[in-house]
Amino acid sequence: MIIRDEINNFLEAEFPQINGDYEIINFSNENISILNHISQKHLRPGGTVSGPTMFALADVSFYIAILANIGTHRSVVTTNCNIDFLKKPSPVNLIAKPRIIKLGKSLIVGDVFIYSEGINEPVARANLTYSYR
């Protein structure tokens, strides 16, 4: 497993467009949590966090979990992502908890639960598959 600083440096260099949006708040062998800093640009009418914001958080957080396990390979790509919106999220920061279920030779399968900060029930659940070489 690589260290948090390596992942942060990689993301800053390769994905400067997301700098400041996401923060790794927990980073250990079995437990990674990513905070999405929510601002007005992430809200939709009705004062709730938009679906595309939650989808992006699921994708980014699972990507970080993969990097933590296999290193900063640039040939890692999303091949599938399905998301279930379970509950209206509060207009606060979101926390994603990614989990790798299977790390195969060329595919990685897992899920991500997304929570409104300070609330224990998930607001969304995503299932993801990535391809890598």
What are the residue ranges of the model-derived segments?
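HotDog/MaoC-like acyl-thioester-processing domains
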Residues: 89-91, 95, 101-133
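Hydrophobic beta-strand-centered segment that forms part of the acyl-chain substrate-binding groove
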Residues: 65-95, 100
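Active-site helix/loop of acyl-thioester processing domains in fatty-acid/polyketide metabolism
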Residues: 52-72
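A conserved, well-ordered hydrophobic junction motif at loop->secondary-structure transitions
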Residues: 39-57
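Non-catalytic linker/capping segments at the edges of enzyme domains
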Residues: 1-35, 40-41
